UniProtKB/Swiss-Prot annotation:
The keyword Repeat does not apply. This is Nuclear receptor subfamily 6 group A member 1-A. It comes from Danio rerio. Residues 230-461 form the NR LBD domain. Residues 147-187 are annotated as: Disordered.
Length: 477
């Protein structure tokens, strides 16, 4: 039913992506099986190969590091589903909330983590602990961290507010979604301004030993300010690395011609090929390209390529996607068999994609913001097998700060813009992970439904076209 040449080409990417849990077009399948030759104990959190007793329970290096970062940085996550997501080696990175929840439920002991965050627990004899449901809820909601931060011995200066932020998917005060969490007040910064020391820490010295986290996402300077010079430089470098030219894939179809499923599928394959090629070229132009190993770049691209492509389609190529590509899908009529066999997973992905298209049309993400979002998503230090996690985390934090600095400077009257933009990243990651599991023969119908719905709902609100985005309204909550 489907063109075999393109099916083989595209399905290879899909299958390799599915096998790694994040996506993977470049990692050899044998690479992840090296350590599976001998019988090993399994991590109690995700079932991966355990490396020892960490914070009281048998676990792998990945869950050990995740638990340590979550507790040390006092991160507060959120689950977009029913707080009961599957935890496996392939699925563990898709929901940080459920991963931390299982760490606590299995008995990982946060008191075994050194306060300075350095390697080596405070007491290696400490075993698993039993935590009440109430205490777990306090930790997951961030209330436990707030209570600790409000203790008198942890106050700082004359500013009684000790609420700070750090990169991560979370929720803020007032139950407002935000990718932030609080840090202990001995690392506090003023909420209503920006200190030179903090800027130098993040942007001026990428390899500094100790990093303070961002000012609170909702704490904005009272007076108008200029963009920090190094933020301007770093953003300029990211934008320069992008190929923002229109996609070269032909999309024009003669009037009256009916597009077949095979033809539409072949077009989607060519689009995926071109977009993937652009991501590979983008990596070579990154300002930090020489700072990381080829092995780490390979793993990062393998894990994030589908997310990068989806982000590009939602932003810099959205006008072309909702224009030329939507016109092609409009000329395709699915058969009754295709309609009846469309899966529940496909329906879920369709609804989430429609929501994201509308959300990005509401935000009108600029090229500068897109470039920062892309770099932040790419620099994912939670991916298995990376050789320089510390440096990746430092680079990630740098571009978090740069993006926040830019949005606060460019959109001073939109105080929630930065957290709204950042909260789109876990949504993209979730959808991309589900998209690679959709049967290939269902993709033409999926994209037809998504683009038809988006174009129909947005056309009545569109007042002008843009090379980056198209104006529209937000979806109803």
């Amino acid at each position: 039913m489907v063109d075999k040449t393109h099916e083989t080409e595209f399905s290879k990417k899909q299958l390799e992506a599915s096998s790694s849990g994040h996506g993977g077009v470049l990692i050899d399948a044998e690479e992840n099986g090296i350590h599976d030759q001998a019988e090993q104990r399994s991590c109690l959190i995700c079932g991966d190969r355990a490396t020892g007793l960490h914070y009281g329970i048998i676990s792998c290096e990945g869950c050990k590091g995740f638990f340590k970062r979550s507790i040390c940085n006092k991160r507060v996550y959120r689950c977009s589903r029913d707080k009961n997501c599957e935890m496996s080696r392939k699925q563990r990175n898709r929901c940080q909330y459920c991963r931390l929840l299982k760490c606590l439920q299995m008995g990982m002991n946060r008191k075994a983590i050194r306060e300075d965050g350095m390697p080596g627990g405070r007491n290696k004899s400490i075993g698993p602990v039993q935590i009440s449901d109430e205490e777990i809820e306090r930790i997951m909601s961030g209330q436990e961290f707030k209570d600790e931060a409000n203790m008198p011995e942890h106050t700082w200066g004359n500013n009684g507010d000790s609420d700070h932020s750090s990169p991560g998917n979370g929720v803020s005060d007032g139950n407002q979604p935000s990718p932030v969490s609080t840090l202990s007040s001995n690392r506090s910064v003023e909420l209503n301004g920006y200190t030179t020391a903090l800027r130098e820490q993040y942007i001026g010295n990428a390899m500094a030993q100790h990093y303070q986290f961002l000012p609170h996402l909702f704490g904005y300077a009272a007076q108008p300010r200029s963009l920090y010079p190094q933020s301007h430089t770093l953003i300029g470098q990211l934008v320069a690395a992008e190929d923002l030219a229109p996609l070269g894939t032909p999309m024009l179809i003669e009037d009256g011609y009916r597009v077949t499923q095979v033809e539409l599928f072949a077009l989607l394959c060519r689009l995926a090929d071109e977009l993937l090629f652009r991501q590979i070229s983008w990596i070579k132009k990154l300002p930090f390209f020489c700072d990381l190993s080829i092995e780490d770049y390979t793993r990062l691209l393998s894990a994030t390529w589908q997310e990068l492509i989806l982000l590009a389609c939602l932003t810099v190529y959205s006008a072309q996607v909702l224009g030329d590509l939507a016109n092609v899908t409009h000329k395709y009529t699915p058969s009754d068999d295709e309609l009846h066999s469309f899966s529940e997973d496909g329906m879920e992905v369709m609804e989430k994609l429609i929501y994201l298209f509308r959300k990005f049309h509401q935000l009108k993400v600029s090229n500068e913001e897109y470039a920062c979002m892309k770099a932040i998503n790419f620099l994912n230090q939670d991916i298995r097998g990376l050789t320089n996690v510390t440096q990746l985390e430092q680079l990630n934090k740098r571009y978090w700060y740069v993006c926040q600095d830019y949005t606060e400077y460019k959109y001073p009257h939109q105080p929630k813009r930065f957290p709204e933009i950042m909260m789109c990243l876990p949504e993209i990651r979730c959808i991309a992970g589900k998209l690679v599991n959709i049967p290939l023969e269902q993709l033409p119908l999926l994209f037809k439904a998504v683009l038809h719905s988006c174009k129909s709902s947005l056309s009545s609100y569109r007042t002008s076209s843009s090379p980056c985005v198209t104006k529209g309204t937000a979806p109803a909550n």
